[in-house]
């Protein structure tokens, strides 16, 4: 995983070209998850699941670069508790009843376009190098496919 920062303009991520040794692996958070955790008791948002509203790193929820909430506890039969993050003055980091805006995925992709092209080219080159090293030992080249998001990306790269 490469380093990233949060883009307040798009609500998305901006990739950098510095490899990161330990990755936090942010994941997108959609309205369905927000509803389950009770975000609708603090903020308003449209009930759409086409674009994420924010990102989560472990149990922390980040909206446009600010950690606004975290979850604690929870289990198979109990709902986790949502804790709204407050600043040093005791005020919520994101004002109560503020409307959440979805991540602008198109603009985020445009801003990361050159970095994504470099990553794609490097990955295709590595795949090709492995193929060339093994092509005399094999009569066909298989790529594992689980159907997950990583497999879908890999399938696109090896076409």
Residue spans of the language-model regions?
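RNA-binding accessory domains that recognize and position tRNA/RNA substrates
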Residues: 1-144, 152-159
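Catalytic cores of secreted/periplasmic lytic hydrolases that degrade extracellular macromolecules
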Residues: 148
């Amino acid at each position: 995983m490469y380093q990233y920062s949060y883009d307040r303009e798009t609500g998305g991520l901006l990739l950098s070209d510095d490899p990161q040794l330990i990755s936090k692996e942010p994941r997108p958070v959609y309205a369905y998850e927000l509803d389950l955790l009770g975000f609708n008791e603090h903020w308003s948002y449209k009930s759409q699941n086409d674009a994420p509203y924010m990102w989560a790193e472990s149990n922390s929820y980040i909206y446009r670069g600010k950690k606004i909430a975290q979850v604690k506890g929870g289990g198979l039969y109990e709902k986790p508790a949502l804790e709204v993050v407050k600043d040093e003055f005791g005020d919520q980091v994101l004002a109560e009843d503020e409307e959440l805006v979805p991540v602008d995925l198109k603009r985020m992709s445009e801003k990361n376009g050159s970095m994504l092209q470099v990553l794609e080219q490097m990955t295709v080159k590595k795949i090709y190098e492995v193929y060339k090293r093994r092509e005399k030992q094999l009569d066909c080249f298989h790529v594992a496919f689980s159907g997950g998001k990583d497999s879908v990306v890999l399938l696109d790269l090896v076409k």
